[in-house]
Amino acid sequence: MTDSNLLGLTCWLIDTRTLWPGQHIKDAASDILHLLSNDERNAVLRKIFIADARMSLASALLKRLYISRALNIPWRDVKIARKGDPTHGKPCAVLPDGSFAPIDFNVSHQAGLVSLVGWNPPPGQSQSALVGTDIVCVNERDDYRTIDQEGFDAWIDIYEDVFSEAERWDMKYNVDYITLLDGRIIQGNSLGRVDRCVRRNKDLSITLPTGETHSFNSDLLIDAKLRRFYSFFCYKEAYIKLAGEALLAPWLKELEFQNVKSPKPGTVARCSTHGTWGEKVSDVEVVLHGEKVEDVKMTLQAFEENFMLATAVQGLRDLEAPPFTKLNLENDVVAFAS
């Protein structure tokens, strides 16, 4: 990564899972914390669990790095405020005269990963844009306990305050594909009414149009539905973070996603290899208050086996978000800040 300022869309990712080992971030990151303001540093130190502190620290570093490079100002001169609500509003960069800088950025973190998406209009382009990002981890929570007790349909209804009735029906009874134990992928439209199954540990059987018959455990179907649920969730979070409202948005259930596909996973990091990116999808349809949204472009990218990262860009419909760039803490962040 060079020292030049950033233009256009930027998508960054930093993995904190192996950073700052130990139990206390104050000791583990003593050589890094001085790069933050007092408020930023205190926010990191208030975290009880070091995993949360790592992500909070990485988030603060990414925001400072982006603002410094996008505005071409020294690291120490970066000032961050919030638009609207001083507590829950969307973070923004503040210029020396106290006005908001004409850039937009958003961060997300989950299970050790931290993402940043930013927009800085190129010279001569006055078009403004809003950006949002979100990260989900499919197997981070103990979702199966409730699913095993009450069924996948009842588990989905836990989120009735977040998703519309149509979205919840779609998640319960539709699936885009399942992956058999031998790696073969069966498209959802070949499953027949097997896709109505909402219980784990059931024996299922399908006959494909070719005449092939496949038998499998319903755990594979529920796994696929669960991954698709998190695709819905990731899209919704990224969209509502465009304006910084998050799940407080009063129009949450009026925001619906159609043609949702869960991107096929990458591979998890092994002893001698890094985790790999999986599929990227960008053909989701967004509906708000019953009307199709035309000015927002969304993408969903799989990373390793369980992560998915969403981007939302409003105001630049024809501009495709670039691939996420994984940053190295020492080479890309600390070296620049120093």
UniProtKB/Swiss-Prot annotation:
<dbReference type="GO" id="GO:0005829">
    <property type="term" value="C:cytosol"/>
</dbReference>
<dbReference type="InterPro" id="IPR037143">
    <property type="entry name" value="4-PPantetheinyl_Trfase_dom_sf"/>
</dbReference>
<dbReference type="Pfam" id="PF22624">
    <property type="entry name" value="AASDHPPT_N"/>
</dbReference>
<dbReference type="InterPro" id="IPR055066">
    <property type="entry name" value="AASDHPPT_N"/>
</dbReference>
<dbReference type="GO" id="GO:0008897">
    <property type="term" value="F:holo-[acyl-carrier-protein] synthase activity"/>
</dbReference>
<dbReference type="GO" id="GO:0019878">
    <property type="term" value="P:lysine biosynthetic process via aminoadipic acid"/>
</dbReference>
<keyword id="KW-0808">Transferase</keyword>
<dbReference type="InterPro" id="IPR050559">
    <property type="entry name" value="P-Pant_transferase_sf"/>
</dbReference>
<protein>
    <recommendedName>
        <fullName>4'-phosphopantetheinyl transferase</fullName>
        <ecNumber>2.7.8.7</ecNumber>
    </recommendedName>
</protein>
<comment type="similarity">
    <text>Belongs to the P-Pant transferase superfamily.</text>
</comment>
<dbReference type="GO" id="GO:0000287">
    <property type="term" value="F:magnesium ion binding"/>
</dbReference>
<comment type="function">
    <text>Acyl-carrier-protein synthase that transfers the 4'-phosphopantetheine moiety from coenzyme A to a Ser of an acyl-carrier-protein. The 4'-phosphopantetheine (4'-PPT) portion of CoA provides the essential prosthetic group for a number of carrier proteins and multi-domain enzymes, priming them for the acceptance of acyl building blocks in fatty acid synthesis and many aspects of secondary metabolism mediated by polyketide synthases (PKSs) and non-ribosomal peptide synthetases (NRPSs).</text>
</comment>
